[in-house]
C-alpha cells in the first residue's frame, strides 16, 4: 500500500469582474434619443387626441393646424421606432455577454479539474504499470481539452473585437445551442466531481482498481466525444461568420450597383435634351 498523500482543495473561482466585459455606457446622442422617445410616449396620447379633433374640425376652421398635428404624430412614432431598435440591440449584446461570462466560469472549473486529475494520475502511477498508462491517457485527454478551450478563448476574443457583427449575425438558434452546450458541460462537471472523490477512495484498495480503470476509460471516451462536438460547433460558428460576411459584401456591391445605375441612366437623357 502506498502512503496517503494530502490533496490540496482547489481555490474558489474568482469573482467575475466586469471591467473587461463591461456593457458600454450609452453616449450623449443615445441619451438624447431616449429622452425624446420617452417624451414622445407622453405626448403621443394627447397628440393623437388632438389629431382626431383636428380631423373633425380642422378642415372647417384651420387646415394648417391639422397638418402640424399630423407631422408631430408621425415624428413621435418615428422616435419610438428608433428607441425600440436601439434597445433591442443592447439587450442582445447583454445576453451574449452573459453567455461569455458563463463560458469563462466553465473554463476555470475545467482547469481546476485538470489539476485534480493530474494529481490523481501521479498517485495511480505509483500503484501499477496499468494505472500509469491510464494516467498518460488522461493527461493527453486533458491536453486536448486545454487546446480546445484555447481555441474557444481566441474565438471569444474575435467576437469582442467585432461586437457590431455579432449583433447582426448571431440569431436565437445559435444562442440556444450555446446554452445547451453550457448545460451539458455543467452536467459533465457535476458527474466528474463525485467521481474524483470515489477515485481517491479507491486508490487505497487495489482489488477494485480494475473496475475504476474501466470507468475512467468510459469517461475518457465521453470527454473525447464532447471535445469533438465542441470542435464541430466552433467550425459551424466560423463558417456562419464567413458566410454572413460574404453575404454582407455581396449586398454592399448590389447596393452600389443600384445607386450607380440611376446616374448612368440619367446622363443619356440629359444629353438628348
From Swiss-Prot:
Keyword Coiled coil: yes
Superkingdom of the organism of origin: Bacteria
Cellular component GO terms held in the UniProt record: extracellular region; host cell membrane; pathogen-containing vacuole membrane
Region (Disordered): 1-20, 254-273
Location in the cell: Secreted; Host vacuole, Host pathogen-containing vacuole, Host pathogen-containing vacuole membrane
The keyword Transmembrane helix is assigned to this record: yes
Species assigned in the record: Chlamydia trachomatis
Membrane topology: Multi-pass membrane protein
Annotated TM spans: 41-61, 64-84
Subunit and interaction comment: Forms homooligomers.
Highest classification ranks of the organism: Bacteria, Pseudomonadati, Chlamydiota, Chlamydiia, Chlamydiales
UniProt keywords, alphabetically: Coiled coil, Host membrane, Membrane, Secreted, Transmembrane, Transmembrane helix, Virulence
Family to which the UniProt record says this protein belongs: Belongs to the IncA family.
Name of protein: Inclusion membrane protein A
